[in-house]
Amino acid sequence: MKTFANANARDLQHAVNLVQQTHQDGRAASFAGGGSDLLALVKERIVAPDVVVNLKTIKGLDQVTATAGGVTIGGLITLDSLGRHPVIRRQYAVLAEAAETVATPQIRNVGTLAGNVCQRPWCWYFRNGFPCLKNGGNTCFSAAGENQFHAIFGGGPSHIVHPSDTAVALVALDARFRVVGPGGERVVPAADFFILPQQDARRENVLGPEEALAEIQVPPARPGMRSTYHKILDREAWTHAVVSAAVVLEMDGQVCRNARLVLGGVAPIPWRLPAVERMLAGQQITESLAARAAGAALEGAKPLAKNAYKVPLTKGVIRRTLLALAARA
């Protein structure tokens, strides 16, 4: 592993300036919050920063602030703290549940929300240094290779899946991300933060090389809102989602007024299902409707040679999650 220098940031603008100055000096730099994904990338020689800018020294970016306008969540909050926070658990169960499914207790005690949202793919070709599209090459080896856990939606030319659990929940909650960079601040809707390989096969989100995700803004919980996160793994030990679903329903008695459904583990971005959402609006969620919604959700799926099993698995996840959430008091 290449050695690197550590630089402690006083605030976000200082952190941005440190990275910018390092780049101007012709050297590589990376931001680090919890650092768990960055350390893995450095050890695997995917990235080789000369300077790592430590964001943990910035005060106040690990808090949850609730107001009438919703909640603001600092990007440096640990996943453990996020999952246990009473406001998040009470009003935004889908986010608390997603945070609780990430990795292991040890990693959740260190890993941050911003880091989980911005983590790089875990495709074995990318992580093992193959000259693939993500590593600057011109081939996606998974297209004709080992693709059991790759995309069935939105793939091509790269077929990675986005690994973040919390990102799926945040898109379902219609969150917004405050980003800080050399040009100042900007706010990006969560649904627009992630980018498909067709847009840029080297990147997974809109962050520039000198930008950092500062905080997450979640709108207020609406009347009758209930939510949940359902994650399917291929083994009992910790791993990333084979398929996951974040579902947010606004219920009026037995009738669904509004719905947001987002899938994880099946696409290069959190994959929203607007056609299914329209099917559910104004309807009572019955066994029949849930089954039809699940079928509609998989229209347009394009599985690869070894991951067609994800199609029926995803249908089952959607159907079961809808029925369980609609029945919840």
Per-region residue spans from a language model:
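C-terminal structural segment of proteins
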Residues: 1-329
